[in-house]
Regions:
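Beta-propeller domains with acidic blade repeats across secreted/periplasmic ectodomains
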Residues: 1-282
Length: 282
């Protein structure tokens, strides 16, 4: 929000009827919050060019705004719908996230305490001039106590949505190009455009899907619970903004990887104004 009205809210359903009963403002005024993950006594927030940690050490559900930490910096914003997104805790204890192919970034620790940008402040023009780890489309991870950042895989389009299956295999959903990928650390994957950093790549890793939907998917979540019928277990669910729907694919092991086959459309909205893009499993 360029107006300064961005808020991080805590919404609670206290009686389990599927409707929100309370609403609290955890923090407001953070410029362009694009990703959230709760942990370690606070909230990790993607607010390009920064990865912020906003503490709540007393547990009162109110951010301690004077103690915000800039953990990392260098994320680009050339294409706002491809910047830092989709935070998710991995089974290894690292914080995972995504970035799209049209927003070059160079990730590093900030100088000193770093700079927390305010709404309408100019974005730094020297973003790509410092030393750091290059990423321009891909999966990355950050260790919250060791303060380490690594690029996990490169490529894709503007991926949104990341999850693991019960055996720790990593999957992401993507837009425009085929919508689902099985991610292996170190992998170089199909790009929507541009060049790979490694000029010696003779081919890249392709999608695992054997079908197509309309173009923009996000919010990948693998269902591993018992509230739905058994046939839904271990399926991967994704929102699709152009179909105004929640779709599902069936993950089938094949060789050292997977094939994603078309599952039933889980939910088709009856109102075109509904555009889902983030899913969570309770």
């Amino acid at each position: 929000s360029g107006s300064g009205d961005s808020r991080i809210l805590i919404i609670e359903d206290t009686n389990g009827d599927g409707r929100a009963d309370s609403r609290k403002v955890f923090a407001e005024g953070i410029a362009f919050p694009s990703a959230l993950a709760v942990g370690f006594g606070g909230v990790f927030v993607g607010a390009p060019p920064n990865l912020l940690f906003i503490p709540d050490r007393d547990g009162d559900d109110v951010a301690e705004m004077d103690d915000i930490e800039v953990r990392l910096t260098g994320w680009g914003i050339r294409d706002r719908h491809e910047t830092i997104n989709s935070f998710h805790w991995g089974p290894d204890g690292w914080l995972y996230g995504l970035e799209g192919f049209a927003t070059p970034s160079k990730i590093r620790r900030p100088i000193g305490k770093g700079k927390i940008y305010k709404h309408n402040e100019p974005f730094p023009e020297d973003l790509l001039e410092a030393d750091g780890i290059d990423i321009n489309g891909g999966v990355w991870k950050y260790h919250p106590t060791k303060d380490r950042f690594e690029a996990v895989a490169h490529g894709f389009s503007n991926p949104w949505g990341i999850d693991y299956n019960s055996k720790g295999q990593l999957f992401i959903s993507a837009c425009v190009i085929p919508h689902l990928f099985h991610v292996v650390p170190g992998g170089i994957y199909h790009r929507q455009g541009g060049q790979h950093f490694n000029s010696y790549i003779y081919d890249d890793i392709k999608t695992i899907v054997d079908h197509r939907h309309r173009s923009a998917h996000g919010g990948a979540r693998i269902y591993m619970s018992d509230a739905f019928p058994p046939m839904q277990n271990n399926r991967i669910f994704m929102a699709n903004i152009h179909e105004h729907a929640v779709l599902s694919d069936i993950l089938v092991s094949r060789g050292s990887g997977f094939v994603a086959k078309h599952g039933e459309d889980f939910m088709m909205a009856n109102n075109a104004q509904w555009i889902g893009f983030s899913l969570e499993i309770g």
